[in-house]
């Protein structure tokens, strides 16, 4: 079972992502900010990280920089409500950039693509 670390400050979004990806057959680990995400990485490495950008404590860009330095092999999907960050050179370190939407179809498709999966089930 593939493991996904979801880093999202909005609790309702975290719950939604947990439920959707767990139902799709993934093991889902949650973190509310970048600092929590780095602590989770000390415990075990996921196969993929879904990372929000605008968060308190440690934002997604700082978090991604630290992850890339220490865990370069873990792919990151940036998932944010702000399309403007796509032009930020730091976002180029991510495998994919997905603007948040009520429909999780694009995010789910990117997860499957980045993990090298086809179809709708991991």
Regions found by a protein language model. Give the residues of each.
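Receiver (REC) domain active-site loop signature in two-component systems and cognate sites
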Residues: 55
């Amino acid at each position: 079972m593939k493991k996904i670390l979801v880093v999202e400050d909005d609790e309702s979004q975290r719950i939604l992502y947990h439920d959707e990806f767990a139902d799709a057959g993934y093991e889902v680990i949650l973190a509310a900010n970048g600092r929590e995400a780095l602590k989770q990485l000390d415990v075990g490495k996921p196969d993929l990280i879904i990372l929000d950008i605008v968060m308190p404590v440690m934002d997604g860009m700082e978090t991604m920089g630290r992850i890339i330095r220490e865990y370069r092999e873990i792919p990151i999907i940036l998932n944010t409500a702000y399309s403007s960050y796509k032009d930020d050179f730091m976002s180029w370190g991510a495998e994919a950039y997905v603007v948040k939407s009520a429909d999780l179809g694009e995010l789910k498709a990117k997860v499957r693509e980045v993990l090298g999966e086809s179809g709708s089930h991991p």
